[in-house]
């Protein structure tokens, strides 16, 4: 909301994008600091930082995308934008899942889990599918510690890679082209309909 309000007030999207990606990169870096003993207050603050940056991005990228096209093409432009965004969401799930599972398998190969049965359960994508407190708490305390350590390290790897993506996006925003957003609309939509009504009214009289 803050990003949208700022964009509406000043009509400049590039500074918002630069700041937003910088904040998001910082927030992802904070995520990598999480440990088993991290408090609820700490990870809640970390999430707020990432959400603040991400929210500023999502609410201001569409106007920037639309700024370069003619008003008659805005419908097609908006449809293309949402297609690209949904396509990105697909990769936003697939890539972290692949990174997570690969890291778990690497840790298991290093002997991170002492019980072969549990290691087999969480290998080959099993850890991603079974990620829940109920799953972890069914094991003895010693094995719970091992399983939590595997999950923590795999999750850290996901956020470490995410930092690269966010940092690269931040660098791209430094070279982002900025154009002045429209303050008035010069569209043909609605004019013919109004004129048609006037002609129809004149004919009926």
Where do the PLM segments sit?
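Alpha-helix boundary/capping detector
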Residues: 1, 32-33, 109-110, 121, ...
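C-terminal module of multi-pass small-molecule transporters
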Residues: 1-113, 155-176
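Short, intrinsically disordered low-complexity segments
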Residues: 84, 102, 128, 196-199
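A near-ubiquitous, low-amplitude feature marking generic local secondary-structure context
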Residues: 28, 35, 48, 60, ...
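Transmembrane-helix exit segments and adjacent C-terminal regions of multi-pass membrane proteins
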Residues: 131-205
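Extracellular/lumenal N-termini and interhelical loops of multi-pass eukaryotic membrane proteins
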Residues: 99-144
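Short, surface-exposed linear patches
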Residues: 39-40, 52, 90, 117, ...
